[in-house]
Amino acid sequence: WLILDTPQDTEQLIECFVPKGEKAKQIFLPDGSEVWVNAESILIYPNTFKGDTRTLFLNGEANFKVSRDKKKPFIVKTATLDIEALGTTFNVESYSNSPQTIATLEEGKIKVSTKDSIPHETILSPNEQFIYDRDTHSREINIVDAQRLSNWKEGQLYFKNAPFGKLVKTIERKYNVTILYDQEKYKNN
């Protein structure tokens, strides 16, 4: 845990960092929301939620079970997407070394907004997954087993039709290892 010093007139920020190879960490936010932060991830949030929103910043992967507060939307900001919820359970994967940002909804509803020059908003329903590729600016929505995909909180890995490169990156992150393989050979697998 690291508490970042900020000027007195602004909120104090808290940084939760989980290194590569470490178990996921469970934290509770000032509003009572529950968050699981995965390996090689950083979550930054204020020590109190002042103002009109509850805004957090994520680089990596985290699972959110949001306390309902219709007057203060809960917003997770990543490099390429903003994900907004009022009271719901969802997962966000947004590693800086991956071109994809993925939002997966378990319960409730979330609004996903791209940060393109022409922003795009999508409302997800349970078991829908929004995938945004920052290199191609492509968007897709898939139907998934959202509960299974968030089993990383319990240390389990689940892959279904995942590209080989994603499988390798996930294992490297979880176990803090480097896997050497012919990337060109497995590029489209």
Give each language-model segment a name:
Residues 1-189:
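A residue-level detector for the "anchor" residue at the start of short, highly conserved motifs
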